[in-house]
Curated annotation (Swiss-Prot):
This is Large ribosomal subunit protein bL36. It comes from Erythrobacter litoralis (strain HTCC2594). Belongs to the bacterial ribosomal protein bL36 family. GO terms for cellular component: ribonucleoprotein complex; ribosome. Disulfide bonds: none annotated. Keywords: Ribonucleoprotein, Ribosomal protein. One of its GO terms (biological process) is translation. InterPro entries: Ribosomal_bL36 (IPR000473), Ribosomal_bL36_sp (IPR035977), Ribosomal_L36_bact (IPR047621). GO terms for molecular function: structural constituent of ribosome.
Amino acid sequence: MKVRNSLKSLKNRHRDCRVIRRRGRTYVINKTNRRFKARQG
């Protein structure tokens, strides 16, 4: 999982990337290709 300040470029890496908020943190997850995971922080 990558930790980045800005998730805008990370959500454009793949067509299926979704931005999710969990427990006050923002994540990018991808169900089809799980290597595109990131957390903001």
